Amino acid sequence: MMRQILTVLAVLLLPVVTQAAELVPHRAVYDMGFLKRAHDTPYAQVDGRMVYHYDLTCTGATYNHRMLLILVSKQGQEIRSETFLSFYETTDGHTMRFDIRELLNDVVVVELQGTVKRPSVGEPGTVTYDKREGPEGEQLAEVPAGALFPMQHTDALISAAIDGSVIHNARTFDGDEVSLVDSFIQPSREPGREAGVVPETMADMKSWISRISFFKPDAEEPVPFYETQMRFWENGLSGDFTMESEDFGVLAELKEVELFDRPDCD
């Protein structure tokens, strides 16, 4: 699920916006459950928890994520799925370090560690893997010009929303593969279930609902392999969201939020 949770995509350069997003360091905890509308799913029950920690330094940003899912098949078999993600991206978008692990029933099935470096966002980047075990497909040696790293995409999406855009397209790289991502954005006019969870300081903060579809660049049919719908605020916090693939769907509900101060880099 790592690539499906993170990937994002379809312009060659970061979008030009009139107002930049002010992302805030934070920690968020989500309870995960079965999304009832998922069709043809092999699972009868899904439970889990996700912890997300976003932090800023004076030279870049870090993203740490742990997700645990307990899946029960229709035959009663229980599967324990864990995903660990750690990213560091420089502010200029020239460098990204990534450390990714996926486990099934406590056995490591995917492990990726490496670095991407490029002269600028508008130029191709070189991928160097320290470890690459488990993922399908050929190892990528070069990231295409204009591809956004995960946190770059988040920043670009929020900036587009602040600017009033209703559609945002991008090409993204998540440490393993390039995806094309189409996002449809609309202002959130209702407070939502999360109103009782987010800090009072966010009571008057703008938020949006976005439907985000992920496509493989070389797919024969323009059908998304993964979709998510989420509420997000202008400070970077995500509220409740869904994750849906062809045969699998999860609902995540925001349960805990901690906001932290931005670093003083003057």
Positions of predicted regions on the chain:
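N-terminal cleavable signal peptides for secretion/export
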Residues: Q19-E78
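Mature, soluble, non-transmembrane domains
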Residues: D99-D266
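A short, structured loop/turn motif at beta-sheet edges
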Residues: A21-P25, H53-T62, Y88-H94, T201-A203, ...
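Hydrophobic/aromatic-rich structural module bridging two neighboring secondary-structure elements via a short loop
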Residues: H65-S120
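Hydrophobic residues positioned within well-ordered beta-strands of beta-sheet architectures
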Residues: A28-Y30, G48-M50, Y63-H65, T83-L85, ...
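Positively charged n-region of N-terminal signal peptides that target proteins for export
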Residues: M1-I5
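Hydrophobic h-region of N-terminal signal peptides that target proteins for export
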Residues: A10-Q19
